[in-house]
């Protein structure tokens, strides 16, 4: 059985920590250390200055369960990679495992390979069977390349006679606490822009990206916009890893890589010499130079005569203009076409059907082999405001292939969304049909004609902001005669031409909705370049405020997969000029003037209480849902029901309709110390906390997330008038009843007027006669 773990380790490995000196001791008294039966000599060179050792467990990489190896040749694979600017000098696998007491020691063992080369074999003696064991396995660092595959394989036998390859006694478990430790030494890279985004971002590195930004003096809003463009680009590259961008106006980072924004008047003295290549700034310029404080670090310099030049240089970077050499002068840049709503590269298009082949990075991800294959996973990032009312679901045109069983059995293709089951399609060589006429019609076709076409409808309730469509091929082994091999190789595949179609859905959603904001950056990311979004800074923003702005823009870039080329950054005094845009506010109650000016519009006032709690709100909160005039969520507590006492280190995240323009949104971050925002970003990167961001108000207290719903709702998007009327009256039956009564009265009044007129005409005609 083959289990392909869709994970990537790298030289740093996510959530890295120092490798314990005695891993076996950590397991407690019940874990025994095992000496491998075969371990090649590890050629571990001493790390050079600047080297580091890091380790990560399978649990830290997302596998919080035991990996089970089953069958006579059960295996599991974990790919890992090494950064371009690091070289591995030593590697160790601390394997924690157990195995079946039924395994024959002289015929069975566990094999560990790196890139197909065996590095260790572990015995399965009877004395240690069924126990949790630990083994430290040195790995020859010469075997470790850029991209690597760690495989664990069980060679298992329970009898010397004919055996069932799937017998229940053939198993071995690999504990999620198993860890891989890599000692790395920095590798010098040339100062060459052609390597970008390396070393500032390396796709091989699965850790969260932390890239400092340095401004030689306090940046104006135009310079910060240029920096935001670059931050959003790096955020789009980081994707699921997440990214934070510490900002500094004090000094260059003491170590590592960083991005620097400067003009001739602010260029650091280290680069003002002629041999630097950047001393004479005559226009938009991008350069890569060594960090003068760290011989292993690099600086990405974005330079220009003024803020306009800086924006042009930042745009060239974000649009991946071809650059080479240590220094590049940016010429004319053709402006990219304006983005259309919902056309973000990372989002499933709602304009036309989307091929599955466009939703995976490699075609091989749609293929599996073996009797116990891994899942086929297709990522689906849907627009948050899809209007799914009265829709059966999302249509999928599925084409799939598989090894046809010789006769009908229990083989099937199971379809699910995240953890929610959708349907089972028997692998009979024909499309599946539930109705008798369709089954009869399908039986007329040729059995085994591939690909099999199946129209599916995916239930919308199972989808989340970042969903995963999963396909599991289950192949039922045929039963053969004793000692006769009747187990041919089997495989299954989802055709890349299979499609998912959102083109029939409108975009309409009740707001505020902080779940859509936290997960997808909505409504700001409705346009991928953020051309209708404005960030409002607090008064006298400090370094932490600058970092928060850059990290937010990086978060938006990760959602859309596109840089925020047209996001605007302003002070509170200029907000009136941006009335027709969605606004994002930052600051404290004192540093952000708009919190005081718009106090009447905030869902939570300065004393932590609701500010718009009226008799109608009290009444509607107590009406049954089907009688309510309001369409807000009723599954969350309201701000009027919560006694909230914000503390200085709390973070308030609020959503409300813009006081400047109907239908426009405001999302506000309020905290006394801008450094508290780092805890909110950490919560976004934690799936267990991210799901708690809901409603119109989120309160982050230490590591606890509390979501509240405000007393007012507004809507964004558009519906055709007939659809809107049907939807509105279905949610507001009281208004429907009143409308019906009003129409009846109007009809009665019209009928009365007509009848009286008709009567008068008859009387006049009769009198004339």
List each language-model region with its residue ranges.
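Bacterial N-terminal signal peptides
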Residues: 2-12
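Solvent-exposed alpha-helical segments and adjacent loops
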Residues: 17-769
């Amino acid at each position: 059985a083959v289990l392909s773990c869709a994970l990537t380790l790298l030289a740093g490995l996510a959530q890295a920590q120092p490798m314990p000196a005695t891993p076996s001791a950590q397991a407690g008294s019940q874990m025994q250390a095992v000496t491998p039966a075969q371990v090649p000599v590890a050629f571990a060179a001493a790390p050079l200055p600047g080297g580091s050792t890091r380790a990560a467990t399978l649990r830290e990489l997302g596998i919080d369960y035991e990996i089970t190896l089953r069958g006579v040749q059960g295996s599991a694979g974990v790919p890992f990679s090494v950064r371009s600017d690091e070289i591995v000098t030593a590697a160790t696998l601390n394997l924690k495992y157990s195995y079946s007491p039924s395994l024959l020691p002289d015929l069975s063992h566990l094999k560990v390979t790196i890139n197909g080369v065996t590095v260790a074999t572990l015995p399965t003696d009877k004395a240690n069977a069924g126990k949790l064991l630990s083994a430290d396995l040195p790995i020859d660092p010469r075997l470790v390349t850029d991209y690597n595959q760690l495989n664990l394989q069980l060679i298992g036998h329970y009898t010397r006679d004919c055996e069932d390859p799937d017998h229940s006694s053939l198993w071995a478990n690999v504990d999620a606490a198993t860890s891989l430790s890599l000692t790395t030494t920095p590798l010098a890279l040339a100062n060459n822009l052609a390597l970008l985004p390396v070393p500032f971002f390396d796709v091989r590195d699965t850790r969260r990206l932390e890239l400092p930004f340095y401004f030689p003096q306090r940046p104006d809003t135009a310079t910060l916009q240029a920096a935001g463009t670059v931050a959003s680009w790096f955020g789009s590259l980081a994707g699921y890893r997440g990214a934070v961008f510490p900002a500094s106006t004090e000094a260059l980072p003491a170590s590592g890589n960083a991005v620097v924004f400067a003009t001739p008047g602010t260029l650091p003295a280290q680069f003002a010499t002629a041999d630097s290549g950047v001393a004479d700034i005559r226009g938009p310029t991008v350069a890569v130079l060594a960090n003068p404080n760290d011989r292993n670090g690099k600086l990405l310099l974005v330079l220009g005569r003024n803020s306009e030049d800086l924006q042009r240089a930042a745009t060239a970077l974000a649009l991946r203009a071809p650059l080479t050499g240590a220094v590049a002068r940016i010429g004319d840049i053709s402006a990219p076409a304006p983005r259309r709503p919902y056309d973000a590269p990372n989002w499933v298009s709602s304009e036309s059907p989307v091929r599955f082949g466009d939703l995976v990075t490699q075609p091989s991800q749609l293929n599996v082999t073996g009797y116990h294959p891994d899942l086929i996973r297709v990522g689906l990032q849907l627009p948050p405001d899809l209007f799914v009312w009265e829709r059966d679901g999302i249509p999928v045109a599925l084409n799939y292939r598989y090894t046809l069983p010789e006769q009908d059995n229990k083989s099937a293709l199971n379809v699910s969304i995240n953890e929610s089951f959708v349907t089972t399609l028997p692998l009979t060589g024909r499309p599946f049909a539930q109705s008798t006429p369709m089954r009869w019609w399908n039986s007329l076709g040729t059995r085994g004609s591939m690909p099999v076409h199946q129209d599916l409808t995916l239930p919308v309730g199972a989808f989340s902001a970042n969903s995963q469509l999963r396909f599991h091929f289950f192949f039922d082994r045929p039963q053969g005669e004793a000692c006769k091999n009747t187990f041919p190789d089997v495989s299954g595949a989802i055709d890349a031409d299979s499609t998912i179609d959102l083109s029939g859905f409108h975009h309409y959603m009740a707001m505020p909705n902080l779940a859509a904001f936290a997960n997808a950056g909505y409504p700001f990311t409705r346009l991928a370049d953020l051309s209708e979004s404005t960030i409002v800074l607090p008064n006298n923003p400090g370094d932490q405020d600058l970092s928060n702005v850059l990290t937010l823009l990086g978060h938006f870039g990760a959602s859309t997969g596109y840089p925020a080329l047209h996001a605007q950054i302003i002070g509170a005094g200029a907000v009136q000029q941006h009335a027709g845009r969605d606004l994002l506010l930052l600051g404290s109650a004192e540093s952000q003037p708009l919190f005081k000016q718009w106090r009447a519009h905030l869902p939570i006032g300065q004393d932590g209480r609701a500010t718009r709690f009226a008799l109608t709100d009290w009444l509607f909160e107590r009406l049954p849902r089907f009688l309510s005039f309001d369409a807000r969520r009723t599954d969350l507590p309201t701000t009027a029901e919560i006694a909230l006492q914000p503390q200085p280190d709390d973070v308030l995240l609020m959503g409300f309709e813009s006081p400047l323009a109907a239908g426009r949104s405001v999302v506000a971050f309020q905290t006394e110390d801008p450094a508290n925002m780092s805890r909110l970003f950490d919560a976004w990167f934690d799936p267990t906390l991210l799901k708690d961001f809901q409603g119109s108000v989120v309160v982050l207290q230490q590591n606890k997330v509390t979501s509240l719903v405000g007393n007012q709702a507004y809507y964004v998007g558009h519906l055709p008038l007939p659809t809107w009327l049907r939807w509105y009256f279905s949610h507001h039956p009281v208004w429907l009843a009143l409308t019906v009564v009003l129409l009846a009265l109007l009809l009665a009044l019209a009928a009365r007027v007509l009848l009286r007129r008709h009567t008068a005409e008859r009387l006049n005609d009769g009198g004339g006669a």
